[in-house]
Amino acid sequence: MIPSYVPPKYKVEVDPNRCMLCERCTIECSWGVYRREGDRIISYSNRCGACHRCVVMCPRDAITIKENAISWRSHPLWDVDARVDIYNQAKTGCILLSGMGNAKEHPIYFDKIVLDACQVTNPSIDPLREPMELRTYIGKKPKQLEFEFVEEEIDGKKIKKAKLKTKIAPNLKLDTPIMIAHMSYGALSLNAHLSFAKAVKECGTFMGTGEGGLPKALYPYADHIITQVASGRFGVNEEYLMKGSAIEIKIGQGAKPGIGGHLPGEKVTAEISATRMIPEGSDAISPAPHHDIYSIEDLAQLVRSLKEATRWKKPVFVKIAAVHNAPAIAVGIATSDADAVVIDGYKGGTGAAPKVFRDHVGIPIEMAIAAVDQRLREEGLRNEISIIASGGIRCSADVFKAIALGADAVYIGTAAMVALGCRVCGRCYTGLCAWGIATQRPELVKRLDPEVGARRVANLIKAWTHEIKELLGAAGINSIESLRGNRDRLRGVGLNEKELEVLGIKAAGE
């Protein structure tokens, strides 16, 4: 066996003066960090991923987890991450997997954008005393409305009434511009999905199925679910397409642009096998491209095929990763008869991605939103398609800024998981999530109570919604529609001229 030259990333300490040997830590840890030996608890720090399950559950607060303060020899080129990756690949000969989004110290542009507020000459609006409209419609909007007048006889009198002549495309109605992103059944547990489904139903918004199909337990919430068609076509049939309120074609993902999804066979249980329509225990590997899409014309054919299969009653979205030519791709999507384009930034999370893709491929979501919105406006197509932004949305201010940059709504994924208890340890792909979120092991899944999870996620969405109303009021705006693409209300701090140009905003003080 080839030895590992990588020291433990974290140091686990159990205070013997506080520990009462209840062995709760040995039960709660799914990684095998703890073992009792006589009258003490032994910890194996090399197995710890800092998921904090043991820390939270310890009744005596006896456990401490710290980053292992090892003094690596400093070098301007060969940083610690580069050396650790080489050690691991020299040991395994494999592609390194990771979870979550880009972990490099690239700029987070949301943090370099500040918001405007009204003062004196342009008074603010008090959302506690005046109505604020956050309702959002996702789908095609007509350029103009045409009416025709028809005569109706009422009480013996002929009266002319205006009747809408323009045909309105199907739209999704959101009570808040926050949706829960596509995370598949298989990558996440059924209890995690039930938590999300109950929460979005309560909040009047939507969640995505991911590419893992729709388990029957979620059928009661289908009115608040967006189904997904990915390159693997897992679980896709007419019943699946008809169940959801909309359909999303997944072309790319922000955490791993250019490649397909991967669900390890150990996560493919009998239930997931039935839902995905694949053999139990087999790896679910999606192809990198859709093998029936090699051009915008091919994409248009799939969009129309899905609309025809659902009797033209459901909007169809197309999801792409935020890449260099995203604006040109978005124009093509807008002309393909799709109703919305979903742009996923490189900070977007994932259950499993090659580390080299996660950390080096794609562009920031902030740049992609602004560039796509501007290009669609220049082409006269902005009303033809909605923009949904995802990938690195952490708080209500990020939602507000994303919409001001040009999005209609946002998806949140990691934030929703954190609400359930996720510690962002990045080891989702192992299937050993101690919080019952990214696992299929029954003894771990049952740790997540769907009722409690739903309450936590709904509380998060409601809290963000209240904060967005407050921010709108401070900006003197009473409708989320008036914020969309309103980049005049944004200013940049510490950005160069080119960055400001791409974002379409001015520097602070201008």
Swiss-Prot record:
SUPFAM superfamilies: 4Fe-4S ferredoxins, FMN-linked oxidoreductases. It holds the Pfam family Glu_synthase. Keywords: 4Fe-4S, Amino-acid biosynthesis, Flavoprotein, FMN, Glutamate biosynthesis, Iron, Iron-sulfur, Metal-binding, NADP, Oxidoreductase, Repeat. This is Archaeal glutamate synthase [NADPH]. Residues 10-37, 38-68 form the 4Fe-4S ferredoxin-type domain. Its cofactor is FMN. Gene3D superfamilies: 3.30.70.20, Aldolase class I. The lineage of its organism: Archaea, Methanobacteriati, Methanobacteriota, Methanomada group, Methanococci. InterPro entries: 4Fe4S_Fe-S-bd (IPR017896), 4Fe4S_Fe_S_CS (IPR017900), Aldolase_TIM (IPR013785), GltB (IPR024188), GltB_archl_type (IPR043578), Glu_synthdom (IPR002932). The keyword Nucleotidyltransferase does not apply. The keyword 4Fe-4S applies. Its EC number is 1.4.1.13. [4Fe-4S] cluster 1 binds at residues 19, 22, 25, 58. [4Fe-4S] cluster 2 binds at residues 29, 48, 51, 54. It comes from Methanocaldococcus jannaschii (strain ATCC 43067 / DSM 2661 / JAL-1 / JCM 10045 / NBRC 100440). One of its GO terms (biological process) is glutamate biosynthetic process. Belongs to the glutamate synthase family. It catalyses: 2 L-glutamate + NADP(+) = L-glutamine + 2-oxoglutarate + NADPH + H(+). GO terms for molecular function: 4 iron, 4 sulfur cluster binding; glutamate synthase (NADPH) activity; metal ion binding.
